[in-house]
Amino acid sequence: MAFVPFQAPQGSTIAVGMSGGVDSSVTAYLLKKQGYDVFGIFMKNWEETFSSGYCSAAEDLEDARDVCQTLDIPLHTVNFVQQYHDRVFQLFLDEYRAGRTPNPDVLCNREIKFAELALYAQQLGADFLATGHYAQRLQSDNHEAALFKGVDAQKDQSYFLHQITPAQLNKAIFPLGGLQKKQVRAIARERGLTTFDKKDSTGICFIGERPFRAFLQQYLPAQKGLMKTPNGEIVGEHMGLMYYTIGQRQGLGIGGIAGASEEPWYVLEKDLSNNVLIVGQGDHPLLYHRVLIAGQLSWLNEAPIAGRFYHAKTRYRQSDQKCRVDYAADGRLQLTFEQLQRAITLGQYAVIYDGERCLGGGVIEARMQGKQDVSS
């Protein structure tokens, strides 16, 4: 099947999700330059009163206004605070409470940006919603929309978009997918957009620059417990299982163990029933798994074919990992990797790729040490 770049029909009205950053700024500029009827929308998803600390929403809105004024396009604002709290943030808390590590940015794209924001854009007369994501929307021979990686491998964001629905993708445009980040900044500078040198946002949007532990403590009471080795030896005390992720090295505070080597300590497992953090040193075997099970599956077009080999990512910016796709009796996805995978984390997403094309994926719910041969 052949795929070609998608071009919105001339005369289309396109809404741009304006974040106040350089990517959405250049997205709006490029679309207007191409002759489309463009307007911006700035959405507010978080209420500053929900938590103490600094929130950049006010500054971001001012930056979005400056850019839209420079480009001479209208800017609308909309409040999705309640929707975000109910459909993204509450699940984020539930997952951490259950000892898993969620990715709220994936949920925000599916539940808010390409659902609530897209609907609001449509009500304002938009034919399409454009965002500053580094991903590509291509079109197949039979005119189906397909999601491909952005050409900038360091910035590709198809991982965060894999849970959107085919209907949502059909109304989405990603003008930056064929550009490098440095090209985007250069365009912004040449056009005189005030966001050309604005720092990229990092981390979870509603946490900002605050320490993660301090933020989470406002919502989930911490229960301290023991750190133990797989053999049951007590080596320290943890501050609450929710604060730790599989493979974590920093912040464990383990030292001076008699008879222990100088190798660093890592989080291996979480024993939820006993409130125990299992830790080990160096490249411990419990850090590595060959098989994972994923549920809550979402496919952009057709599902991967059982028994075939694809590539997968189990976290953002991971290099593609070759794996065989199978399905468990209950319909969940089973991936068997060619190479052992380090620190597969429950609650994160396993995303499947066929070459550069993103097929979709699901939430990692289990992992196994499986040793079976999966050579193709």
Swiss-Prot record:
One of its GO terms (cellular component) is cytoplasm. It is found in: Cytoplasm. The active site is at residues 108, 205. Its EC number is 2.8.1.13. Disulfide bonds join 108-205. Residues 155-157, 315-316 are annotated as: Interaction with tRNA. It catalyses: S-sulfanyl-L-cysteinyl-[protein] + uridine(34) in tRNA + AH2 + ATP = 2-thiouridine(34) in tRNA + L-cysteinyl-[protein] + A + AMP + diphosphate + H(+). Residues 103-105 are annotated as: Interaction with target base in tRNA. GO terms for biological process: tRNA wobble position uridine thiolation. PANTHER family: MITOCHONDRIAL TRNA-SPECIFIC 2-THIOURIDYLASE 1, TRNA 5-METHYLAMINOMETHYL-2-THIOURIDYLATE -METHYLTRANSFERASE. This is tRNA-specific 2-thiouridylase MnmA. The gene is mnmA.
